């Protein structure tokens, strides 16, 4: 089944050209199916790039998805046009009375800030509380996942001495998990962050289970069944060239940065990088959506009751 997004959203043509099944409102209205209602709270500066990355992953399953793009109510995006935000995004204040089968909360390049110093932290905490009554399952990504696990469990993020940057092998620590169905014993995941969550602090919280982890960059994917949440601290959603864009940007700006580990062939930035995570990215998000489909309420309004 396809993902339903506006035909004028930039991702529509991009995904159509890649063979992803997408459809507009007209076709959706002719189908007698209850689509999964998925929200994407996009905290990244490059909204179009990020919304396309996640739409690509959640639009590649047999399930029909109705995607709602959400922004923080008062925060104004500086890197995406006001016209795009007005046309395609709904402020959280406008959707807080709705119910969703799933919600993805993206990362944000604000790791250097304490959580409480983030300008929209108070509203984001409202979002976290709202997920417990209005959302069946939530997926926090990178900083979004760190913020969620901090809010619900007090687990702190820690500044790294050097940026974790590159493609790192991660071990499958829970082969029986429905979220890792079809996963191999290890997989490569893009990493781009200045902070980490410590495994010992996650292990100290009853009920949390680490599903994927790396000896080099630490825990990656954590399940929190008590809050119907997954937290992932790395970037399965990244395009092939995303790390290259970040590296080239820092080099151009004179920002000290190492060549991303295990990304370019022979670690040579002159060579084109290879995507070694795409299949596992689709598996993870497909498994997450399938688990939602198997466990959510048919009557959307019963979620949280």
Curated annotation (Swiss-Prot):
CDD domains: GATase1_HTS. InterPro entries: Class_I_gatase-like, HST_MetA, MetA_family. It is an enzyme of class 2 (transferase). The record marks 111 as: Important for acyl-CoA specificity. Pathway: Amino-acid biosynthesis; L-methionine biosynthesis via de novo pathway; O-acetyl-L-homoserine from L-homoserine: step 1/1. One of its GO terms (biological process) is L-methionine biosynthetic process from homoserine via O-succinyl-L-homoserine and cystathionine. GO terms for molecular function: homoserine O-acetyltransferase activity; homoserine O-succinyltransferase activity. Keywords: Acyltransferase, Amino-acid biosynthesis, Cytoplasm, Methionine biosynthesis, Transferase. The record marks 192 as: Important for substrate specificity. It is found in: Cytoplasm. Its EC number is 2.3.1.31. It holds the Pfam family HTS. It catalyses: L-homoserine + acetyl-CoA = O-acetyl-L-homoserine + CoA. The active site is at residues 142, 235, 237. Belongs to the MetA family. Transfers an acetyl group from acetyl-CoA to L-homoserine, forming acetyl-L-homoserine. PANTHER family: HOMOSERINE O-SUCCINYLTRANSFERASE. This is Homoserine O-acetyltransferase. It comes from Dinoroseobacter shibae (strain DSM 16493 / NCIMB 14021 / DFL 12). The lineage of its organism: Bacteria, Pseudomonadati, Pseudomonadota, Alphaproteobacteria, Rhodobacterales. The gene is metAA.
